[in-house]
Amino acid sequence: MSKNNPQAFLRDVADIIDERGKTHGHWRENMEVTAKMWSLFLGHYLSRPITAEQAAVMMGLLKVSRMACRSVTEEHCEDFVGYGGLAGGLLRVKNQESLET
């Protein structure tokens, strides 16, 4: 099967998320800590804290801004898609937890 298709690209991104988990920690905990740090830093500007899924989306936006200022690279695209996957995963966890309560 060709590796030059969207499905192969997404499988590669899933592998990257797994690999980075070994060095950066679990994706859910990482985004929760990031959200808390951003909420503390932005404190008086915000009316409510940033959620973990919002932090993941904002990390994706960071990748978009890098692509807008420089060039689009495969790595930036992988990271952008990966952060979207983290946001989606966080929302699934949140939705499941709300169903259980």
Regions found by a protein language model. Name each.
Residues 1-101:
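Intrinsically disordered, low-complexity regulatory regions
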